[in-house]
Amino acid sequence: MTQQRTLKNTIRATGVGLHSGDKVYMTLRPAPVDHGIVFRRVDLEPVVEVPADAELVTETTLCTGLTCNGAKIQTVEHLMSALAGLGVDNVIVELSSAELPIMDGSSGPFVFLLQSAGIVEQNKAKRFIRIKQPVEVREGDKVARFEPYEGYKLGFTIEFNHPMIPAKQSRQEIEFSTSAYVKEISRARTFGFMRDLEYMRERNLGLGGSMDNAIVLDEFRVLNEDGLRYTNEFVRHKILDAIGDLYLAGGAILGAYEGFKSGHALNNKLVRALLADQAAWEWVSFPEGTEQSPVTYASPVYA
C-alpha cells in the first residue's frame, strides 16, 4: 500500500519573503488524513485558512500566489515542490505574513526542515491523479502538456539568449522519485537578470532578493561568487517550480509533464485545463493488497 504522509513533529523556520522583503515566521504542523496542504495566516484576525488549490491561484508573476477570503499567500511553489518531492500529503503551514520565506532560493532548506520534523505514514491510501488523455495549453510559443505515463516524468526546455545558458544546458528530464528529486532538483536556485531589476522594483517585486537566495546574472556571467550548483541549474529550477505548481492539482501526478518555456502562469493554466476535463484524468490509489504505486518515495524519516 502507498500511504498518505504527514509530519511527525511541528517545526519552525524564519526568513524573508523574496518579493515583499518582509520577515516571516513559518510553522509546519502535522495534519490528519485527507486534510491536504493548508496555509494559515495567523497574523490576521480572525485567522484565515487558504487551501493549496490551483483554482485559488491569483498571482503568477515571478511566483505562484493564492487568495482565499481576502487573504493572500505568495511564493508557495518551493515549499509545495519539497512536499511533493517527499510525498507529504497533509500539513498545516502557519505564516505570520503573506509570503513564504525564500530561504536560499531552492527547495533544499524546505526538504531539510521536513526531514528534520520527521515524516510518518498514515492509515489511508495516498490519492494520485492519473493522466488518461493528453492535455496541452499554449501561450505564444510557450507550451505545457500532460500525457499518460506509468509513473511521473518531467521534461523541460528553456530558451535564454545568454552565454551562461547555452542550448546544451537548456534541457532536463527527470524520472520522478524522492531520491532523484532530492539529488537532482531540490538544490537548484531561482535566478534573475540584472536587466530585469528595474521592472521588478517598479512593481515592488524582488525586494527581499539577494545573492544569498538567487542566482544573479548580468549580460555575460553569473555574479554569485560561489557559481552554480549544477551546470544546468537554471532549467533544473524550472522543473522544481513545475513540480510545486503541479502539486496544487490536489494530489500527486501519475503522468508525463513537458514544458517548453513554460512558467507559473502556464503551469497553472495546464492544471486548471486538466481538472476541467473529467475524461482526461482519474483518482487512483494503491490500497493494501494491491501493487505499489509506480512512483518511488523514500522510506519515512522518523525524527
Curated annotation (Swiss-Prot):
Record's keyword annotation contains Lipid metabolism: yes
Binding site for Zn(2+): 78, 237, 241
Pathway: Glycolipid biosynthesis; lipid IV(A) biosynthesis; lipid IV(A) from (3R)-3-hydroxytetradecanoyl-[acyl-carrier-protein] and UDP-N-acetyl-alpha-D-glucosamine: step 2/6
GO biological process: lipid A biosynthetic process
GO function term, MF aspect, one: metal ion binding
UniProt enzyme class: hydrolase
Pfam families registered for this protein in UniProt: LpxC
Cofactor needs: Zn(2+)
Transmembrane segments: none
GO CC annotation, single: membrane
Catalytic activity: a UDP-3-O-[(3R)-3-hydroxyacyl]-N-acetyl-alpha-D-glucosamine + H2O = a UDP-3-O-[(3R)-3-hydroxyacyl]-alpha-D-glucosamine + acetate
Function: Catalyzes the hydrolysis of UDP-3-O-myristoyl-N-acetylglucosamine to form UDP-3-O-myristoylglucosamine and acetate, the committed step in lipid A biosynthesis.
PANTHER family linked to this entry: UDP-3-O-ACYL-N-ACETYLGLUCOSAMINE DEACETYLASE 1, MITOCHONDRIAL-RELATED
Protein known as: UDP-3-O-acyl-N-acetylglucosamine deacetylase
Source organism per UniProt: Xanthomonas campestris pv. campestris (strain B100)
Gene: lpxC
